[in-house]
Amino acid sequence: MSYIPYVVEKTARGERSYDIYSRLLKDRIIMLSGEVNDAVASSIVAQMLFLEAEDPEKDIYFYINSPGGVVTAGMAIYDTMNYIRPDVATICVGQAASMGAFLLSSGAKGKRYALPHARIMIHQPLGGAQGQATDIAIQAKEILRMKEELNAILAKNCSQSIKKVEKDTDRDNFMSAEESKEYGMIDEVLLKKSKE
């Protein structure tokens, strides 16, 4: 069981207690901490839709610390990021691996960041197949289709050729924050938060 801190906010009307994630949501901050799965994706999609309804013009800040996860769940988040009107700024804290890295690169151009000691890792989609030979063939065909789709999007996000992305994702490919900037995954390594 994970521990979720609570914060107490004092207002003219008295005190109010929030779990930390609800409090961050008030500031248009969404956290992805851990594996990308259907439950996590549903929560993140709902938060993005809520923030769009609150103010379609203000940016959303999407902090990512994830080892990756289920491709279809990640694509639900990706499609929502592109569907909603606000820009989604992405910030890697800790790690963005696999689908986490894909989502990091999918933030609004010019608004994709990583902290200095973050690790970013890209690779091809993982999958396993069992069952009858024809079912395994169907699953193999689908994972190859997904691989092509993900590589095409990643190539566009990073301004790289599809051939380069195919080569670079053939095996686990780890990058530092600075290397991921050179690759085009992010736009800037954040050293200190601005005092705006």
Swiss-Prot record:
Q: What is its EC number?
A: 3.4.21.92
Catalytic activity of the protein: Hydrolysis of proteins to small peptides in the presence of ATP and magnesium. alpha-casein is the usual test substrate. In the absence of ATP, only oligopeptides shorter than five residues are hydrolyzed (such as succinyl-Leu-Tyr-|-NHMec, and Leu-Tyr-Leu-|-Tyr-Trp, in which cleavage of the -Tyr-|-Leu- and -Tyr-|-Trp bonds also occurs)
Q: Which residues cross the membrane?
A: none
Name the catalytic site residues: S98, H123
- Keyword vocabulary terms for this entry: Cytoplasm, Hydrolase, Protease, Serine protease
One GO BP annotation here? protein quality control for misfolded or incompletely synthesized proteins
**InterPro entries per record:** ClpP, ClpP/crotonase-like_dom_sf, ClpP/TepA, ClpP_His_AS, ClpP_Ser_AS
Main location as per UniProt: cytoplasm
GO cellular component entries: cytoplasm; endopeptidase Clp complex
Q: Which PROSITE patterns match?
A: CLP_PROTEASE_HIS, CLP_PROTEASE_SER
Q: CDD domains of this UniProt entry? A: S14_ClpP_2
Q: Which Gene3D superfamilies match?
A: 2-enoyl-CoA Hydratase, Chain A, domain 1 (3.90.226.10)
> What role does it play?
Cleaves peptides in various proteins in a process that requires ATP hydrolysis. Has a chymotrypsin-like activity. Plays a major role in the degradation of misfolded proteins.
Subunit relationships: Fourteen ClpP subunits assemble into 2 heptameric rings which stack back to back to give a disk-like structure with a central cavity, resembling the structure of eukaryotic proteasomes.
Task: Give the similarity note.
Answer: Belongs to the peptidase S14 family.
Identify the NCBIfam families for this entry.
clpP, PRK00277.1, PRK12553.1
Q: This chain belongs to which protein, by name?
A: ATP-dependent Clp protease proteolytic subunit
The record lists the organism as Sulfurimonas denitrificans (strain ATCC 33889 / DSM 1251)
Taxonomy of origin reads:
Bacteria, Pseudomonadati, Campylobacterota, Epsilonproteobacteria, Campylobacterales
